[in-house]
Amino acid sequence: MGELFRSEEMTLAQLFLQSEAAYCCVSELGELGKVQFRDLNPDVNVFQRKFVNEVRRCEEMDRKLRFVEKEIRKANIPIMDTGENPEVPFPRDMIDLEANFEKIENELKEINTNQEALKRNFLELTELKFILRKTQQFFDEMADPDLLEESSSLLEPSEMGRGTPLRLGFVAGVINRERIPTFERMLWRVCRGNVFLRQAEIENPLEDPVTGDYVHKSVFIIFFQGDQLKNRVKKICEGFRASLYPCPETPQERKEMASGVNTRIDDLQMVLNQTEDHRQRVLQAAAKNIRVWFIKVRKMKAIYHTLNLCNIDVTQKCLIAEVWCPVTDLDSIQFALRRGTEHSGSTVPSILNRMQTNQTPPTYNKTNKFTYGFQNIVDAYGIGTYREINPAPYTIITFPFLFAVMFGDLGHGILMTLFAVWMVLKESRILSQKNENEMFSTIFSGRYIILLMGVFSIYTGLIYNDCFSKSLNIFGSSWSVRPMFDIYNWTEETLRGNPVLQLNPAVTGVFGGPYPFGIDPIWNIATNKLTFLNSFKMKMSVILGIIHMLFGVSLSLFNHTYFKKPLNIYFGFIPEIIFMTSLFGYLVILIFYKWTAYNAKTSEKAPSLLIHFINMFLFSYGDSGNSMLYSGQKGIQCFLVVVALLCVPWMLLFKPLVLRRQYLRRKHLGTLNFGGIRVGNGPTEEDAEIIQHDQLSTHSEDAEEPTEDEVFDFGDTMVHQAIHTIEYCLGCISNTASYLRLWALSLAHAQLSEVLWTMVIHIGLKVKSLAGGLALFFIFAAFATLTVAILLIMEGLSAFLHALRLHWVEFQNKFYSGTGFKFLPFSFEHIREGKFDD
């Protein structure tokens, strides 16, 4: 059915790689990205494998590159990305790479260490400069006789009486500004008020040499008397992480020190600038190549990690690997192996042998940028079983269509389409930017899904004739009120006296026929609008749901045919399709029949389909108030119900009984027993050897029909079949009801849109003055914001999730088992894209 409708045919192959060529061959296979290696050493510890040292060396180089990258980003230097895909370095080149990275790392560490020491020295000199400047102001203030009274508490009364000369000690330092209040309280309490503290803020913040952050600090000077207070003050300063600096006592000494400090600061600033320039040059040179280095190192690491999955023969000259690969790509894989052998200079070619296996191969569905998003929707439910029907190509149409049935609005569909078209047109630019925003990346990866959802929403919006809750009168309404004036003698008084009047479509000229496309715009102003639309959308939901489920059941036939399971066709597919069509397919026929059999004149006598369908199961036909739809209805409905009931034992009993009979017959005829020696014609040991051109088994799942060695358990088979039968029969009812969400979501979206129009934009349209025009500007902004936030994003997400549910449960469970595992080829693609995470 083609590569899109069914997963690729896979084969298990064995590779024989010469030791000197293994690295280059695996490198070429990584560039190709078409093989998935199997681990042939599952019981060997990861630290005991052959190439563990090479992997560690690659990890060490990777660590050094991450350090360099961190420094580059810290310096706000852009990393150059030319999109280049460098070739994998040879193993002998690893030494040069290690030496280069070691040199860059050591150089950066040395620069950082020197720069940190210089900055710390610069900080100390800067703080000392401010201390000398501020303390001079403090001492000038202390010379003021008015301050003598403030400092009198530092002197004992007896000493003041004796006229002893005043001998005060002091310490000066710098402290973080936010610690000043606590620092001051601690000094006061510990020293009992016998110290004098003066502090002044440093206007400019100072750079912390360790963190690089800018910190606001203050200069302080503390006066005290005696060694005991001096020790207490120093301990408090140490506890608050204050930096203390020596400060001369005389103004002349302070002036000379300040001059020397300024000179040293100027010299140090020059050295710092030169150091920073050198650091920038090193980082800029590294920024030009770091992406290429990352790719090279990650490729080498991936190759050695893959080589650790291989076996080594006893001669130590050959590596043996097992890979899953698509059959269609065998030639390109052979060519890649030849190319790798040539690059390595080996004279012995690498060998690829296909193997026979009963193991289930991985599932590989080829995708492009358009089908990728839809395949992800399917894979999110479960990876398809090998070679079963792939729902993705059908989902491309059904998913956006069912979404649009719930979301249908012309205006909202246009907005969604425009957004998707913008992403599609700008996809190359957006991809090159490598946006790391996870939410935007998710939306961008589904740009084609959003595009189709928007296009289908425009289509369903035209059918509903709904654009921002308003109808478009494109072709002119088919309804006319004029004949009601002629036939029923309506007058102007009739219009004034009756707030609501009903048009009679049975009157000639009132209804001129169906609207050319979609729903007549006159229904937008009708009071019974919801009654009409609910009936239409409910029946439409049932019809679409039953067709969708019948299509899913029909797809199961292709699976049964491909996997050669005739029992599933005779005792699964046929009764399932009969059961669904005899009950729910008949309901669809009744809906279409009622639409065509009754017109405006006879619609009053139209019976209720709901009551008819319920009576069909109850075999109740005595209700005279609900007339028959057609002659012979009773007999046909009784026949259909009986047929549906007969399908239940057909699905439940026949398959287990046939399987049991086949098992007993095989057990009786499959082997003979002569003297306790079992004789048979099973495969020999030689048949299981590696062969070059064998064909992989079509279906390697657990077979439906047990082999002669398997013990057939009739009880388990019966229970399994009973579960399947009950699930299908009840699922037909519940799944049909589940499709009514199409009607419910469509109704909710239309009502929300109408409420938003009435409660927001209509307010601005009602005001006829100039102020109303000005108010409309702001009201429209609110209307646009609410439309995008509620109706496009929230309602769109809700409809998206409901469409997911309808596909995962109601559609895919009819034919899709989803019990496989994904094909994960060894590929350098993610490394090339800059996704360096393992």
UniProtKB/Swiss-Prot annotation:
Cytoplasmic side: 1-388, 427-441, 556-573, 660-725, 811-838
Any one of the GO BP annotations: proton transmembrane transport
Compartment(s) where it occurs, according to its Swiss-Prot or TrEMBL record: Cytoplasmic vesicle, Clathrin-coated vesicle membrane; Cytoplasmic vesicle, Secretory vesicle, Synaptic vesicle membrane; Melanosome
Chain positions with Phosphotyrosine modification: 364
Bilayer disposition of the protein: Multi-pass membrane protein
A molecular function (GO) term: ATPase binding
InterPro entries: V-ATPase_116kDa_su (IPR002490), V-type_ATPase_116kDa_su_euka (IPR026028)
Main location: membrane
Phosphothreonine modification, residue list: 250, 360
A GO cellular component entry from the record: vacuolar proton-transporting V-type ATPase, V0 domain
Residue numbers on the Vacuolar membrane side: 408-409, 472-535, 595-639, 751-771
Signal peptide as annotated in the record: none
Transmembrane segments: 389-407, 410-426, 442-471, 536-555, 574-594, 640-659, 726-750, 772-810
Keyword entries, A-Z: Cytoplasmic vesicle, Hydrogen ion transport, Ion transport, Membrane, Phosphoprotein, Synapse, Transmembrane, Transmembrane helix, Transport
Family per record: Belongs to the V-ATPase 116 kDa subunit family.
Its job: Subunit of the V0 complex of vacuolar(H+)-ATPase (V-ATPase), a multisubunit enzyme composed of a peripheral complex (V1) that hydrolyzes ATP and a membrane integral complex (V0) that translocates protons. V-ATPase is responsible for the acidification of various organelles, such as lysosomes, endosomes, the trans-Golgi network, and secretory granules, including synaptic vesicles. In certain cell types, can be exported to the plasma membrane, where it is involved in the acidification of the extracellular environment. Required for assembly and activity of the vacuolar ATPase.
Subunit structure: V-ATPase is a heteromultimeric enzyme made up of two complexes: the ATP-hydrolytic V1 complex and the proton translocation V0 complex. The V1 complex consists of three catalytic AB heterodimers that form a heterohexamer, three peripheral stalks each consisting of EG heterodimers, one central rotor including subunits D and F, and the regulatory subunits C and H. The proton translocation complex V0 consists of the proton transport subunit a, a ring of proteolipid subunits c9c'', rotary subunit d, subunits e and f, and the accessory subunits ATP6AP1/Ac45 and ATP6AP2/PRR. Interacts with SPAAR.
Protein name: V-type proton ATPase 116 kDa subunit a 1
Organism: Bos taurus (Bovine)
Lineage: Eukaryota, Metazoa, Chordata, Craniata, Vertebrata
